[in-house]
Amino acid sequence: MLTPSAFGSPHVSVIRGQPAYEDEALLRGQIEAAIAAIDLPADFIQPGEHVVIKPNWVKEHDTRTPHDEASWLAIITHPAFVREVARWAARQLRGTGRVTLCDAPQSDSSFDAIRRLHRLDDLIEECRRDFPGVTFTLFDMRCEEWKVVDGVTVSKRELPSDPAGAVDVHLDEKSEFFGFPGLGK
């Protein structure tokens, strides 16, 4: 059962829209309609605050078709959607604050490939240009990236991770998975 947190009760909004990734105005309108349906308080985002946006950047390609660079469409948040949500957040900050785009993809994913395929550096630069008083940051939250060949991890590369630091949490017997067989023991 979900209970209210320090951030309030959970809210979800679903709208039926047109698949409009190429039409920025239509996509922006659909995103704004979905956000409006949540009925956030007017002061939900204040100038000077830090907004964190966590898209789903699971993997740079569908593992069933690794050589098809378009296979990412079904497994990540579309970059046009990420761009419009980041721009919405920047507008709420009214010229001052921070927007961070970050995720922790699968350990065997290449964040460099995700950045390249989705032109995330261009997205960040565009936002910096259009919202000069807002700081935009992009980073991979993982501590390491694995190289996997034929299902076998052959190397691991340490990553800088979250510049604000990391905390290890050990739930042990408090975990919902405690007592079940598998890697979560």
Show which residues each predicted segment covers:
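N-terminal and secondary-structure boundary signal
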Residues: M1-K185
